């Protein structure tokens, strides 16, 4: 089991400190603030539909993680003396030994290595949990996310939807 207290200090490409940590129950406001700071096109690339708000059911799904079948990390940085969530990543077990990953990073921090840090930590946690494979569904135009996943060894696999690129990473 991945501890709900997981926390690692890292640095962005520009040298600023960042914390990659487990999502906590009290992070909902910070997560929603991060979504508000993310442009609609970035959210569409993450959710595959135009998204500006979430239903109560969606919020509950995103916040109710068990760190076994649903693992979620946030990227948090100090902004003007206050912690601010600037990104998040998660994996959800979709069948025994396999999980799907997804990420979102606030636009102002894209290109600073946040997505790569989240990916690295989720891959490490998935290996520690003895998962055999991670997968991600990415829109063809989401080149930045495709590049991040490619650096970690994700490769194109056959998916069900021709409008979406299905990537997989064997962990074993």
Q: Which residues fall in each region the model found?
A:
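Long, contiguous binding/interaction regions
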Residues: 1-172
């Amino acid at each position: 089991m991945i501890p709900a207290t997981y926390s690692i200090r890292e640095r962005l490409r520009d040298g600023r400190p960042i914390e990659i940590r487990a999502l906590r129950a009290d992070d909902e406001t910070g997560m929603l603030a991060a979504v508000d700071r993310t442009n609609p096109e970035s959210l569409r690339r993450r959710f595959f539909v135009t998204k500006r708000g979430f239903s109560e059911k969606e919020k509950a799904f995103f916040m109710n993680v068990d760190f076994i079948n649903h693992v979620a990390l946030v990227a948090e940085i100090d902004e003007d003396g206050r912690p601010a969530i600037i990104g998040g990543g998660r994996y959800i077990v979709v069948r025994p030994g396999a999980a799907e990953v997804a990420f979102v990073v606030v636009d102002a921090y894209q290109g600073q290595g946040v997505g790569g840090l989240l990916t690295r930590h989720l891959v490490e946690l998935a290996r520690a949990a003895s998962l055999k494979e991670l997968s991600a569904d990415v829109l063809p135009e989401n080149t930045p996310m495709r590049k991040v996943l490619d650096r970690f060894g994700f490769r194109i696999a056959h998916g069900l939807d021709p409008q979406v690129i299905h990537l997989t990473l064997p962990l074993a």
